[in-house]
A protein has these predicted regions:
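Thiol/disulfide oxidoreductase modules built on the thioredoxin-like
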Residues: 41-50
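Conserved N-terminal glycine/acidic-rich loop preference
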Residues: 60-66, 70-72
Length: 75
């Protein structure tokens, strides 16, 4: 399962979500700007407040680290 913790105004979040869509991956988009519980979950998982944070089956990737994301997805 893939979760993307993001905000509507984050350009890297948009880039990340477009990348996942282009590669054919479905994901849960979690807007942490209006969901305090999700924001706390994101900080607990990643140790940081910044977005995007990607959770790929429990592997946490902070930011749009394209090579690390591709590796985690088996691309």
């Amino acid at each position: 399962m893939i979760k993307v913790y993001s905000t509507p105004t984050c350009p890297y979040c948009v880039t990340l979500k477009n990348f996942l869509k282009e590669k054919g991956f479905e994901f849960e988009d979690i807007d942490v700007s209006n969901n305090q519980q999700a924001a706390e979950e994101m900080v607990q998982k990643s140790g940081q407040m910044g977005v995007p944070v990607l959770d790929i089956d429990g592997e946490i990737i902070a930011g749009f680290d394209k090579e690390r994301i591709k590796q985690a997805l088996g691309l």
